[in-house]
Amino acid sequence: MSESSIKIENVVASTKLAEEFDLTVIESQFEGAEYNKQKFPGLVYRVSDPKAAFLVFTSGKVVCTGAKNVADVHTVIGNMAKKLNSIGIKTMENPQITVQNIVASADLHTILNLNAIAIGLGLENIEYEPEQFPGLVYRIDEPKVVVLIFSSGKLVVTGGKTPEDCESGVEVVRQQLDNMGLL
């Protein structure tokens, strides 16, 4: 599978760190935090090492986005909890972190004929309207991911819950294109 190994571009995960948060307190204590409830109901806070962004809500829920791997998600959420504790906001110990979505890219290193692929894959699982979007949207049932296929041979996989889901999605596409003689 080395020809089509994936590169994780973004991991989105969520957790609950407390029963509730006072976002104005967090905004005043966290340098660079942005909170304007007229525009958005959550506080936005970005960190740089590892790089990620948080959406923090009054419900105590936190969404982490922008991490490049699942380990970084755990690291930055742990760091966020420590930082909240350091300003006197108690957080839950060992919060359950749920990966909501992984976006990955891959390259098949070949030019693809999307019209032939659309016909070969059948219309029930694909969307291809080149006048509106240059890629073919392929919905795979197992693993449950969506793969955007571009004529350049580049793929974008979204909807995976694990890196393995994304790898498997790429492998499904590669095998199906190979079976159709389109690789």
UniProtKB/Swiss-Prot annotation:
PROSITE patterns: TFIID (PS00351)
Entry GO MF terms: DNA binding; DNA-binding transcription factor activity
Alphabetical list of InterPro entries matching this protein: TBP, TBP_archaea, TBP_CS, TBP_dom_sf
Residue spans of the Sequence repeats: 8-84, 99-177
Record keyword Secreted present: no
SUPFAM superfamilies to which the protein is assigned, alphabetical: TATA-box binding protein-like (SSF55945)
Alphabetically ordered keywords of this record: DNA-binding, Repeat, Transcription, Transcription regulation
Coiled-coil region list: none
Alphabetical GO biological process terms: DNA-templated transcription initiation
Function field: General factor that plays a role in the activation of archaeal genes transcribed by RNA polymerase. Binds specifically to the TATA box promoter element which lies close to the position of transcription initiation.
HAMAP family membership: TATA_bind_prot_arch
Family: Belongs to the TBP family.
Protein name, UniProt field: TATA-box-binding protein 2
Organism: Methanosarcina mazei (strain ATCC BAA-159 / DSM 3647 / Goe1 / Go1 / JCM 11833 / OCM 88)
Gene: tbp2
